[in-house]
Structures are given as C-alpha cells and as structure tokens.
C-alpha cells in the first residue's frame, strides 16, 4: 500500500508520509504500537491522537512479527538467539566474496537485477555482448524517470504492517517496506523513521535504486529530507554500463554521487572475479559519467597484479578529463615503452589529449592533439617532440636527434558554397615513422606526407578550387615528388542546353616545382652513395607552369532501353618550363628543351548501350536478369608530345573500366592517341528486394592504329601491346552466395601472348548475424605495371627488376606481383577463436607475413596471443630491397572491458591491416 503525503511541513516530508501509512486512514482509524491510539490529522497538520479503550483493542489485528534482525520500538536492531544462546549467523560479508556477487543473497544473483541470457528479450539481447551469459536489467518501477528535485518531490511509503510511537516520534514499518521519493526508491524488510532526527534506519535486504543505479546491503541509514544514505555490506550495479562492485559500506550523496569504502569495481559477471579494481576510496559520479579511486590494485582472480595511487575511469560513454588506460610494450628498437594518455575535456565542441610516451632506449616522447568542432568546420592540431637518445642512425644523412612532428587536419565551410580543407603533416627526418609510433588520430604513415590546403567555391553548375599541395618525404628510397604551388581549377557545365546539347569545361592552371637533392647519401655505416635524385635526367628535371583547357560538347540521348552519347572534346595545353644545366646536358634521345611548349588535341567519342531484362527463376529463386551490351568508339589523333615533361602523369592500369575512358593516361601531360572500338557486356542477377546476386562483365577493344604516344623513354615499337590489334580480354565477376558470402574476381587475358597480364580473386565470408567468423582467401597477379625506376631514372614497362643485372642490389622481378593471402578468425569452442594469416610471394619465394594464435573473449575481458613473422622495412640504405628484413615476435594483448587495454595495442593494429572484416567484427563486439 502506498499513499501520497499531504501538505505537511517540508522539514520532514518522508516521516509524515510514513506516519500516514502507519495510520492507514482510508482503511482503519488506528495504528499498531506499544499502546493503542486513534489518530487523525489536525487542521494544523499535526497529529491528533487519543488512547483507545481496551474493548476496542480486542478487535485489533495482531502485531507485526519480526525476523531475526527486527527493529525495536526505539529503532535499534535486535537479534534472535537459539535455545543454546548462540547468535544466528547473518549475511555473508562482501569482503569474503573475493570480487564476486554474494550468492548468500540470491543463488542466481537476481538481487543484482541479473537476468540470464535465455530470459532476455530480443531488444535486450541486441545490447548484450556476444559472450555474456546475461545482463543487468533494471525493473520497471513507478517514478524511475521522475526528474522532480528531491526537496520538492512527494514521498510514497508502503509496508505490510506498521506501528507508531508518538512519544518517541518513531514510525516502525515491517514487511516489504518501500519508500519512494522522486526517482529514488528504497526497499527493506524493516524500517524505523525518526521524525525528530529527520532520518530513517532500514534493515534486512536493503535495496536503494536511483538513476540507473542499484545498491544492495544488510542495513542502511537514510537522511529523509535530502536522500543521503549509507548502506552497509553493500553491493552495487550500474545497469547501462554493466558495472558492479561491493564495499564495506556505500554512501549516496544528495547529488546521487556514490562513494565506496574499501570498494571494488568491475564489468565482469556476478559469478566472475576475472578482474577487479580494489581501492580504499572509490567515487562514482553518474552526473559526469566518471569515477575515481585511490590506493588501487588491479586484481586478477583476486590476486593483485598492478598498483596505482590514483585512477580516473569512465562509468559510461561520456567524455571527462582524466587519465586514459595506459599502454605497456617491450622489445624492438625502443625497449620498454609506457604510454599514459591524459584527456582534457575542455568543452562540448573541443578537447585535447596528451600522450607522454616513455621509451627506455630513446627517452620521453611528448605528443598531443587538439580537436575542435564548430558549426561549419571540424579538425585537429597535433604535435610531438623527442630528444632521441638512440644513436643508431647518427651517421645517416638527413637524421636529426631532435625529432618532431606537426599535423593539422581541417574540413569546413564558410557557408553552403565555400569549402575549406587542410591536410598538413611535417616531420623532422625521413625515418620518423620507421622509428616511432604515433597515437594521433588520422595521421597517415606513407612515404609521401601530404601538405595541402584548398579553398573551393561551388556554384549552381560549376566549381572553382584554389589548391596548394606539397609533399614531405618520409623515406630515402624514393625521389623527390613535384609540388603544386599553386593550382587553380574551374570545372562545370553551361546552364543552357540548346537542342539537348551539353557543354562542359575543365580548366586548370598549376605550377609544378621541386627541389632535387644533390650530393651524397651516407648510410648507417658511414658509406657514401649517390642520391637517387641525381639519377633523374633530361626533361624530368624541369619545373614549370601548365595551363590546360578542355571544353567539350555532347548530345546525351537516353531511353528506357538504352543510351547514345556522341561527344567532341578539345584539349589545349600550354607550358612555361625551367630546366637546370644537368637536365639540359642529359636529354633523352629525341627530346628537345624549349621554355615554351604547347599542345592541342581533339578527342571524338561515341558511347552507347542497350538494356534488356527478363524475369527468371534459378534454383527455385525469382530473379530479374539483365543483359547490358555497351559499344564505345574513340578517336584521338597522334600528337608528338616527346618534348613535354611529365609532372603528374602515368599510364592507367588496364581493366574493364579502362575500355571506356577517353585517355589511357592519368594526368594532363600525355593525351594517348587511339583509334579503337571497345565492346563490353554486363549480365546481372537481381532479386526482388534489389539485392544483386551476381554480376559478370567482359569486354575487349579493337585497335585500328598503333599507340605511338608513350611516356618519356618508352618506345612504342618495343611494346607488343602498343602494336597489337586487340586489347586483352577484361573480365570482372562478383557472386554473392548470400549476404554473408562474397566472391570477387578480375582477370585480364592477352590473346596475342596467350598469357595473363593481371588478375585477382578474392573470397570473403563474414556472417551478418555473427561477424565473429571471418574467412578471407585471395590471389593477386600483375606483370603489366608501368612505373618510374628510381635507381635508373627511367620509365619501365612490365613487372620490372630492381637495378641492373650484375649490380650489388639487383633483384629480379622485384616489382612483379604474384601473391596469395589467406586469413581467418574462427570460433573453435565457445569464447575461443583461432586467428591466422599467411601472405606469400611466389615470385620471390618468401613469406611476407604470417601469424597464428588464439583469442579468448568473455563478457569482461579479452586476451589475444599471436606468434608473428613479417618482413620489416627499416631504411638504412637507398636500395629498397636492402631495407627489408624478416622479423619475429610473440604478441600478447589483454583488454579489460570497461577499463581499456592493458597491453598489446600493436596486435590490434596488424590485425586491422591484415584481416578484411576485422574492424567490423570489433565494432560489433563493443
């Protein structure tokens, strides 16, 4: 039974309401107490009680019967003794549970709102980890979402029986006692409410609930006007965060902060003590979403393994300043490594993180980042600094022991039309990322670090961009790339279409320049060799301005059954060049230098296609089958471009899509001459819901003239594919067995040489309803690459050797690709999974990477142990093959869920890079 309190004085709202419950005004006019009284509420709001006659008392119900720890009339706890005089044992102390829940309170831990997995609803299962045997589910109760402040909220009280002592001003409740005010609810077997002291004492199976938190104990003291409480021999649960623990006593403050004395904290299930944090004083603040603890030991199976005087940890997913989980590693060139990140929650729209990284062999690396989010932009600044104590590279060129990195990434819009973007990274030396790790988000570890800023204006039918882009070398085994300083583009479509004609234009003005490195390169042993930039010769050493104009007119005609698009395009390019004396003296055969160059090339094409479909049935399944033939004619006359340098151009990789391009080169420095007819056909099988079960495409080009325009130094007469009458067959195939199984393949077959130019096949399996299972099997082959050879300064066609036969660093077919890649993560028994990958290079008969190990995963922690072999790349020479060295290691990763990774962050890194689907698996798991 529960009654809403009337308008009594606010000093003591809970006691007055409890007295009303004891009075039971709607059912009886009496209470059960040491003496019997008739009581009613006076006009002033006070009690008006008179003794009952003995005759009336005969018909009263029996007094409440109390258990072994009942509350006496004066509010003290009594105990029950056996006939021998021995005290009956009470509830087990939480200190005896060794980090687990108390089974003495409930064998199934239902006293902690624990619900076994088989009893969870579908919605609750979706929020439960895959290896959790259940979840903490807060029961629905009145007032659980009440936001009324405690001082203004009325109180409701219920009990099976009650009595009131007017002289002592103590109300005693017994049997399923419930006190509820605002969002807080307290349950117990017995309660004594003291009006004079404005407090309550509760005994027996005490449960305090408020704001998604539950505290269970043997007895409690409650401040009736503020909601402050102390619960002895306490266990607690934070439902949404799956957090639990215990304490000698727990205190709930008026602001709902929970303080634990000699308490524990864990995300493990009630029957598990796999890991716990145990501290002298633990504070949990639901308002901020974080907790603190002092004199903390991390315990595994109740065995202390780590001590810290202070820790700051999250209890939900909100941000708050404090230390993040540390990372501990050992081995490699850095020795023992400890990272202790500290997070600064500066404002809702910006924050910062400091990453002090101590390396025993190098010293202290200080790294930090600042992130911001505004109404029209987002981005981050970052930086790092280290005075390196490792002198392994002290003789090498370009090395600096004062090592640093800066980074800025930005995306924004001044309004709906103006866009800004910055991607800038700079480092002290080219070996920075080979020697040092970084914790900054978004920093890309590549050979060429991007240093770019752009401003774009988007009109209704056009876009204009001002771009400045440079590159910083993070390697000594590559030549210096060109910078675009600056670049201006204007691309768009005219807003009118007379007669259905479409007018497009592409405009670019750009300055290309680079500072080639001269002199000698010194390796780790002090040996000298010529820098790779010295191998660059002829027009490849030029800097210059380029203006490129490419207007076009087309007539798109589209019907339900197909399309036809004739198009005429005109490309005009103007160059203003600078060439140093070394370039002028080393021109390639046929090259001539002129400071002013121009080129104009017309391009005519006709693109057409048909669309056929029908309904069909395959193995009892209905499909829409399509047949989509495509015909593309392209004519580009030959234009001598030998005297034009190559700034940003290379030859496109041949595949099915390249059959329908109007230029076989990327960039604007070469316009390929072509007179060809490309034929292709695509077949699709589509289910009624739009799911594409299968797609198959095959095509080939018929050439009517040789392709004479080539990259510098490449002679078309030496290339069989430049003189062939037909292109290789280009095939693409994809089949989805279902939404879990997928097979992709592309294959390019040369009919003239009767050999494969390139191809790949990839099988991927990852069930949508169980992404923990992953199988990948792939094969790649490519022997048709067109690349620039840094060691010779020449363009090379085909797989390509490194160096020349007889050279000390010569490696045959170094750039030819012939590899298989197999990876798997597969559950072998519940909670145990096998992890493996094997990437093998058939061309060089070597394993590129192989690892194998296992993963154990449960509700509160995860462990991975992996034995790995890989080809490590650490530059001590300009010859790339000499920098490759096999390495081995055994990696251990331990993740305490709800606390963070203890060790092994590198395991997560190479699994993410090496196993397709790994990131989706981890995102689902957490």
Curated annotation (Swiss-Prot):
GO BP field: Gram-negative-bacterium-type cell outer membrane assembly; lipopolysaccharide transport
Any Pfam family: LptD
Where is region (Disordered) located? 58-99
Alphabetical UniProt keywords: Cell outer membrane, Membrane, Signal
Q: Which InterPro entries does the annotation name?
A: LipoPS_assembly_LptD (IPR020889), LptD (IPR050218), LptD_C (IPR007543), OstA-like_N (IPR005653)
**Localization annotation:** Cell outer membrane
Q: Which GO terms describe its cellular component?
A: cell outer membrane; transporter complex
List where Low complexity composition bias occurs. Answer: 68-85
Q: Which residues form the signal peptide?
A: 1-22
Main subcellular location: membrane
State the similarity comment.
Belongs to the LptD family.
Subunit (UniProt): Component of the lipopolysaccharide transport and assembly complex. Interacts with LptE and LptA.
**Which function does this protein serve?**
Together with LptE, is involved in the assembly of lipopolysaccharide (LPS) at the surface of the outer membrane.
Can you name this protein?
Answer: LPS-assembly protein LptD
Highest classification ranks of the organism: Bacteria, Pseudomonadati, Pseudomonadota, Gammaproteobacteria, Pseudomonadales
């Amino acid at each position: 039974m529960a009654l809403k309190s009337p308008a009594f004085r606010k000093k003591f709202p809970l006691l007055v309401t409890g007295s009303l419950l004891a009075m039971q005004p709607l059912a009886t006019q009496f209470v059960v107490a040491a003496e019997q009284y008739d009581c009613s509420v006076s006009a002033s709001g006070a009690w008006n009680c008179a003794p009952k006659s003995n005759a009336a008392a005969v018909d009263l119900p029996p007094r409440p019967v109390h258990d072994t720890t009942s509350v006496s009339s004066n509010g003290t706890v009594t105990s029950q003794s056996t006939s021998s005089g021995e005290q009956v044992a009470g509830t087990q102390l939480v200190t005896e549970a060794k980090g687990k829940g108390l089974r003495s309170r409930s064998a199934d831990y239902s006293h902690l709102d624990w619900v076994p997995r088989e009893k969870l609803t579908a919605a609750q299962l979706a929020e439960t980890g895959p290896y959790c045997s259940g979840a903490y589910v807060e029961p629905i109760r009145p007032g659980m979402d009440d936001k009324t402040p405690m001082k203004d909220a009325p109180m409701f009280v219920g009990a099976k029986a009650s009595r009131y002592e007017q002289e002592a001003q103590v109300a005693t409740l017994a049997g399923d006692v419930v006190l509820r005010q605002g969002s807080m609810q307290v349950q117990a077997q017995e309660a004594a409410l003291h009006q004079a002291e404005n407090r309550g004492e509760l005994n027996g199976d005490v449960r305090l609930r408020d704001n998604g938190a539950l505290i269970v104990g043997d007895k409690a003291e409650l401040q009736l006007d503020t909601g402050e409480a102390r619960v002895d021999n306490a266990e607690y649960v934070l439902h949404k965060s799956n957090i639990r623990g215990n304490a000698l006593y727990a205190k709930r403050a008026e602001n709902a902060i929970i303080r634990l004395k000699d308490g524990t904290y864990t995300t493990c299930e009630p029957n598990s003590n796999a890991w716990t944090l145990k501290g002298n004083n633990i504070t949990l603040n639901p308002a901020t979403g974080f907790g603190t603890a002092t004199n903390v030991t991390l315990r595994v199976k109740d065995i202390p393994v780590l001590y810290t005087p202070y820790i700051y940890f999250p209890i939900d997913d909100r941000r708050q300043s404090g230390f993040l989980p540390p990372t501990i590693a050992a081995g490699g060139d850095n020795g023992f490594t400890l990272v202790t990140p500290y997070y600064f929650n500066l404002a809702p729209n910006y924050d910062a993180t400091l990453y002090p990284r101590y390396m025993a062999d190098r010293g202290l690396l200080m790294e930090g980042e600042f992130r911001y989010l505004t109404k029209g932009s987002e981005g981050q600044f970052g930086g790092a600094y280290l005075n390196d104590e490792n002198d392994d590279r002290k003789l090498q060129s370009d090395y600096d022991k004062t090592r640093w990195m800066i980074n800025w990434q930005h995306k924004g819009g001044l309004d709906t039309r103006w866009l800004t973007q910055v991607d800038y990274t700079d480092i002290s030396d080219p070996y920075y990322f080979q020697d040092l790790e970084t914790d900054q988000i978004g920093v890309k570890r590549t050979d060429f670090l991007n240093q770019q800023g752009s401003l774009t204006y988007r009109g209704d039918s056009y876009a204009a961009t001002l771009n400045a882009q440079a590159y910083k070398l993070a390697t000594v085994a590559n030549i210096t790339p060109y910078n675009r300083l600056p670049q201006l583009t204007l691309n768009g479509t005219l807003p009118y279409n007379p007669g259905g004609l479409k007018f497009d234009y592409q405009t670019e003005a750009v300055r290309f320049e680079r500072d080639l490195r001269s002199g000698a390169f010194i390796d780790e042993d002090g040996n000298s060799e010529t820098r790779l930039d010295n191998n660059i010769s002829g027009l490849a050493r030029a800097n210059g301005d380029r203006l490129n104009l490419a207007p076009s007119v087309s007539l798109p005609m589209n019907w339900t059954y197909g399309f036809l698009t004739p198009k005429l395009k005109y490309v005009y390019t103007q160059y203003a060049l600078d060439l140093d004396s070394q370039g002028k003296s080393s021109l390639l055969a046929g090259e001539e230098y002129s400071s002013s160059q121009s080129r104009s090339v017309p391009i005519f094409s006709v693109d057409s296609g048909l669309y056929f479909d029908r309904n069909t049935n395959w193995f009892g399944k209905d499909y829409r089958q399509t047949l989509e033939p495509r015909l593309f004619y392209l004519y580009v006359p030959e234009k001598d471009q030998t005297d034009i340098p190559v700034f940003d151009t290379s030859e496109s990789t041949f595949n099915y899509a390249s059959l329908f391009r109007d230029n076989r080169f990327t960039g604007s420095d070469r316009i390929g001459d072509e007179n060809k007819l490309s034929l292709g056909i695509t077949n699709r099988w589509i289910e009624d819901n739009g799911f594409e079960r299968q797609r198959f495409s095959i095509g080939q080009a018929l050439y009517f003239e040789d392709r004479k325009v080539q990259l510098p130094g490449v002679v078309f007469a030496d290339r069989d594919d430049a003189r062939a009458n037909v292109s290789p067959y280009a095939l693409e195939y994809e089949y989805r067995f279902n939404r879990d199984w997928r097979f992709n393949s592309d294959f390019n077959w040369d009919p003239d040489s009767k050999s494969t130019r390139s191809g790949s096949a990839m099988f991927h399996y990852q069930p949508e309803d169980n992404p923990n299972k992953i199988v990948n099997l792939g094969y790649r082959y490519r022997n048709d690459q067109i690349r620039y050879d840094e060691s010779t300064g020449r363009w090379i066609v085909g797989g390509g050797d490194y160096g020349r036969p007889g050279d000390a660093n010569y490696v045959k077919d170094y750039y030819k690709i012939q590899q298989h890649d197999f990876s798997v993560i597969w559950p072998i028994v519940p909670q145990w999974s096998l992890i493996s990958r094997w990437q093998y290079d058939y061309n060089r008969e070597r394993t590129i990477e192989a690892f194998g190990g296992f993963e154990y995963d449960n509700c509160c922690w995860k462990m991975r142990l992996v034995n790995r072999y890989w080809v490590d790349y650490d530059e001590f020479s300009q010859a790339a093959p000499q920098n490759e060295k096999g390495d081995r290691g055994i990696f251990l990763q331990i993740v305490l869920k709800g606390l963070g990774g203890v060790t092994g962050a590198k395991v997560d890194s190479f699994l993410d890079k090496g196993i397709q689907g790994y990131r989706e698996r981890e995102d689902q798991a957490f």
